[in-house]
């Protein structure tokens, strides 16, 4: 996920904790009174009976919260202004359409929160949050990330990596050398929190049939990192190749007898910008659904670390299932089975090489999409009910939100009319923004305080769905594929203190 801007790449469905013995408190939530293994119990999160925020809670909440989302008729902005309100119902919530179109996807905020960046069919666009002015920033964009200030780093096959801003010309950052009969692409741009390291995957493509429309992927050329010189912002200090290039594609196929060969790409940085989490992806859809390999690059020592060591475990290959916590501890969903999302456990991996992994017990639950508080004391996640022996999975999977503290697991949501999924922690750590799906497939965006108070609906997405035109990037209805919902690149969150 990121201290100020959180980008949601894919929504996950969540399931109600069923069959839990215990009492029902006055807020309507259940509490399990008995110990479930040594890790603790499952209960309802503490909420005031009248639903209002107490003074301590109000101080912790952001004064303003902005949420971008892409519907199939345009890009929308939700503005939440608390303005001293005592509860969620009194906070001012407004929704406006920033840009029209049926081809908008992958929205995200600039680091200062003043610009919305997003994809259209012809490229990467920016739109001013204040004026609504829209501008094409890069034709044919492949990848883009906020640049730590008011603009974005972006890449295309023609330009390489550039820095783009609204109302200003592009600034060249790094352009690959020409390739005879093809070109090099810089993909999966990933900027460190301190803004000094920009990692990317470099891939070579060739035109084997002399037709640009029939070009083929040829070779992974490793993961690279630009060490930025912030005193001379347009210059580079160091260009480092983190992982070397692989043999060309067809040579690899001969070497491996057609077995899938991993495609390595950078995913997330640690909060202190010293470590980079890397996926070892595969082309096989069935293998990918069960999980893939991972690696961590330590920029201080210049060494690569295998976070799972010699364990025969794989990780669900979605960025929302991996997060760094305090002290560079890594939290991810790992397991060795073939039941995709349903046999994975929440694992905490200490930063020390070779350290013993800790499997965090979530009794009766199958977690997904963890978020870690900035003090490292709380873990928030979506979870479905654990299947009984012999029970068959039914899609879509139903989930709810939970919080874990000191081994104690508490429900944050428990409305059986909704599946609550993919929580995203705001930059100040006080609010979770998440998606919900009802039993008819309707989608909506909600927020809740991390202590379980202030549950609030922010927008009904189905109200903005056009019936005569369809955004090819936007799901017409909710579908759950291999235990992961199809809300891909719909939402971005920005909180103001």
Where are these regions (language model features)?
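Positively charged n-region of N-terminal signal peptides that target proteins for export
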Residues: 1-6, 10
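C-terminal motif of bacterial Sec signal peptides marking the signal peptidase cleavage site
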Residues: 16-19
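Short glycine- and basic-residue-enriched patches
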Residues: 13
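Sequence signature of WD/YWTD-type beta-propeller architectures
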Residues: 24-497
């Amino acid at each position: 996920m990121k201290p100020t801007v959180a980008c949601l790449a894919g929504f996950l469905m969540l399931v109600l904790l069923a069959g839990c013995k215990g009492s029902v408190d006055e807020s309507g939530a259940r509490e399990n009174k008995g110990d479930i293994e040594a890790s603790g119990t499952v209960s309802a999160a503490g909420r005031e009976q009248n639903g209002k925020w107490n003074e301590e809670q109000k101080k912790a909440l952001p004064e303003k919260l902005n949420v971008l989302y892409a519907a199939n008729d345009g890009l929308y902005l939700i503005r939440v202004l608390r303005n001293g309100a005592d509860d969620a119902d009194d906070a001012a919530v407004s929704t406006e359409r920033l840009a029209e179109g049926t081809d908008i996807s992958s929205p995200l905020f600039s680091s200062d929160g003043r610009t919305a960046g997003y994809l259209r069919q012809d490229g990467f666009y920016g739109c001013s949050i204040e004026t609504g002015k829209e501008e094409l920033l890069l034709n044919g964009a492949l990848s883009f990330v906020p640049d730590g200030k008011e603009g974005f780093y972006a890449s295309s096959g023609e330009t390489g990596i550039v820095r783009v801003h609204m109302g200003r010309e592009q600034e060249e950052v790094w352009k690959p050398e020409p390739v005879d009969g093809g070109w090099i692409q810089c993909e999966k741009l990933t900027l460190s929190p301190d803004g000094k390291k920009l990692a990317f995957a470099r891939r070579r493509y060739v035109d084997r049939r002399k037709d640009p429309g029939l070009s083929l992927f040829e070779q992974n050329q490793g993961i690279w990192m630009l060490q930025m010189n912030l005193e001379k912002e347009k210059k580079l200090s160091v260009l480092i190749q983190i992982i070397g290039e692989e043999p060309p594609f067809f040579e690899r196929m001969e070497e491996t007898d057609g077995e899938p060969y991993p495609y390595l790409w950078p995913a997330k940085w640690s909060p202190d910008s010293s470590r980079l989490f890397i996926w070892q992806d595969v082309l096989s859809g069935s293998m990918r659904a069960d999980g893939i390999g991972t690696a961590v690059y330590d920029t201080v020592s210049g060494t690569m670390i295998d976070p799972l060591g010699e364990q025969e475990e794989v990780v669900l290959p979605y960025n929302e299932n991996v997060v760094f916590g305090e002290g560079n501890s890594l939290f991810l969903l790992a397991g060795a089975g073939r039941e995709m999302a349903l046999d994975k456990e929440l694992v905490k991996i200490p930063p020390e090489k070779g350290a013993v992994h800790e499997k965090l017990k979530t009794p009766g639950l199958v977690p997904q999409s963890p978020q870690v508080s900035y003090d490292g004391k709380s873990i928030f996640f979506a979870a479905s009910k654990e299947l009984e022996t012999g029970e068959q999975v039914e899609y879509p999977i139903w989930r709810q939100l939970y919080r874990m503290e000191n081994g104690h697991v508490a429900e944050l949501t428990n409305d059986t009319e909704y599946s609550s999924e993919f929580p995203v922690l705001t930059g100040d750590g006080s609010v979770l923004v998440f998606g919900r799906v009802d039993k008819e497939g309707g989608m909506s965006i909600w927020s809740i305080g991390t202590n379980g108070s202030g549950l609030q609906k922010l927008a009904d997405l189905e109200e903005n769905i056009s019936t005569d035109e369809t955004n090819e990037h936007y799901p017409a209805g909710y579908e759950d594929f291999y235990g992961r919902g199809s809300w891909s690149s719909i939402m971005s969150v920005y909180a103001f203190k």
